[in-house]
Regions:
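Beta-lactam-recognizing serine transpeptidase/beta-lactamase-like catalytic domain environment
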Residues: 1-203, 254-264
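Short amphipathic alpha-helical face segments that pack within enzyme cores
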Residues: 84-90, 214-221
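Short, gly/Ser/Thr-rich active-site loops of penicillin-recognizing serine hydrolases
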Residues: 116-125, 216-264
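A short, polar/proline- and glycine-enriched secondary-structure boundary/capping micro-motif
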Residues: 129-132, 211-215
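A generic structural motif
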Residues: 206-209
Length: 264
């Protein structure tokens, strides 16, 4: 998925995702070795706990090594691996469409006030997922099962549109200003409909707790709006777009009305 590659969205200040592989571990060690080897002199009083002191001592000696805990974190996307919601959305869209990684875009065109189209923008193909089609097929089946009988089943029970997705609960270390422990980061990543996908929707809520109970509920509400779901039925007239399909054509823009001249 080229995780460290930006999605290329036409908005300023996009953040880069990070993959905590061996190269990252070595780079991180070079940048932080001096701090950990002089931890007692540089850490704040609140950071002088037995656990953090022991961690600093280990990081000073062999912080560039990939330990068993790092490998476990790497396998489930926790630890030092960091993804932006946009990047995860791009990844789920690629899984849904068969493996094509597309540049993400907001703008479709530049249009004058008189309706004249100055320039149109077409998304660019950034690459393809480097895996076998059978692996993508397995992933799609697994993501559907999450919503049918897994951790996403409860929130989408009786939903009339087939959703494929995955709950996520990112563990967080630390305390809030009031002294309470920080809650986990809630995630829900998805695409729909499962068989002929039109949308990829991802939600992340900082300190939101479990993925299904917080982000899953928010994603469900988004799909209700997109597809016009009322109760357990699809009501076409209630959809945000006709038949729940994203628009492909530019909207018609009427020429702007010329302002009246002030009377002399």
């Amino acid at each position: 998925f080229d995780i460290t590659q930006k999605v290329g969205i036409d908005l300023p200040s996009e953040s880069t995702s990070r993959l905590a592989d061996r190269d990252y571990k070595k780079s991180w060690y070079q940048q932080n070795k001096d701090f950990y080897c002089n931890y007692k002199e540089r850490a704040t009083k609140a950071q002088q706990t037995a656990f953090l002191l022991q961690l600093a001592a280990e990081n000073c000696v062999d912080g560039d090594k990939v330990r068993a805990g790092d490998a476990v974190n790497f396998s489930i996307g926790q630890g030092d691996t960091v993804l932006t919601p946009l990047k995860l959305t791009q990844m789920y869209a690629a899984i849904a469409n068969g493996g094509t990684i597309w540049q993400m875009m907001v703008a479709k065109a530049i249009v004058k006030t008189d309706g004249t189209v100055v320039k149109t923008f077409t998304p660019q193909k950034l690459g393809t997922v480097k895996t076998a089609p059978s692996v993508l097929s397995f992933l799609r089946g697994s993501l559907r099962e999450v919503v049918v009988s897994g951790t996403g089943a409860g929130v989408f029970a009786g939903f009339p549109v087939e959703i494929s997705g995955k709950t996520g609960t990112g563990q967080v270390f630390g305390r809030n200003p009031n002294g309470s422990l920080k809650d986990d980061t809630s995630w829900f990543a998805s695409y729909a409909p499962s068989k002929n996908p039109r949308y990829a929707v991802v939600m992340m809520v900082g300190q939101g707790g479990f993925g299904a109970s917080t982000s899953g509920v928010g994603v469900k509400q988004i799909y209700q709006t997109l597809f016009g779901v009322v109760g357990n039925k699809v009501v076409p007239g209630a959809a945000l777009f006709p038949e729940g399909k994203p628009p492909t054509k530019l909207p018609k823009i009427s020429p702007a009305t010329k302002p009246k001249e002030a009377s002399k």
